[in-house]
Amino acid sequence: MLTIDKLTKRFGEKTAVDAATIRVEKPTMIGIIGRSGAGKSTLLRMLNCLSSASEGTITFEGEEITGLRGAARRNWQSRCAMIFQQFNLVPRMDVVSNVLHGTLNKRSTFATMFNLYPQSDIHRAIEILDRLGIAEQAAKRAEALSGGQQQRVAIARALMQNPKIILADEPIASLDPMNAQVVMQALRRIHEEDGRMVIANLHTLDTARRYCDRVIGMRDGRIVFDGTPAQLTTGVARDIYGAGAGFSEAATSTEIDALDKPDIPTAKAYA
């Protein structure tokens, strides 16, 4: 389904991603972990064609993705949607219009200039917002929403593209623990209910273990771990993060006792 073969990205003499190889045979929820500068974001940007690879290839369903240009690249970016830590919403625009921006590459220049949307798209946008629990916020400006709500708007915008893959670059890094769990539960539901592949860069081990079927660890641009959440032991984590014997997972935990049992089963239930 998705094959990443020896993918490499260099910035001058620095190698940000070094011969990354990943094979995904079916829609899966994958968490990528590693310290800052490990190459996680660069890897996702190459997957989305926001950044070109120095070497290596990306293939999805038999189609070569590496090096796409113009309309072909825009089409791929619709099939492989991306959300970011910063949300990237238009603050003074209402929520539903932000969601509808997910259809921009499918609309004419005239429709884009005058902000014209078909009723069917508007209804679909509201349905997606309702699915994410924020339909009542549709008419509000994006800037009036909390961080967790804004990230769900960004997810809704991605879903408007009807993608096969959702890439999430540190989607909960700027959120409090409660909102972080709401966002991760939403991504897990999208994977389970829609059969979409979700690949998320994550900064906490407990989040990767709880929500992901597969965890990939990166260190200094290289993939040093690729396995199940159960295989992600403290010793393995120490190696991924290059930490000493004093390494503590608790320092990065996002667990909340009150939310210990989410509305959906954890990833372990699907292992």
Swiss-Prot record:
E.C. number: 7.3.2.2
Annotated function: Part of the ABC transporter complex PhnCDE involved in phosphonates import. Responsible for energy coupling to the transport system.
Record has ATP-binding as a keyword: yes
Gene: phnC2
Designated name of the protein: Phosphonates import ATP-binding protein PhnC 2
Record-stated family: Belongs to the ABC transporter superfamily. Phosphonates importer (TC 3.A.1.9.1) family.
Record's bilayer topology term: Peripheral membrane protein
Domain of life of the native organism: Bacteria
The ABC transporter domain, residue ranges: 2-245
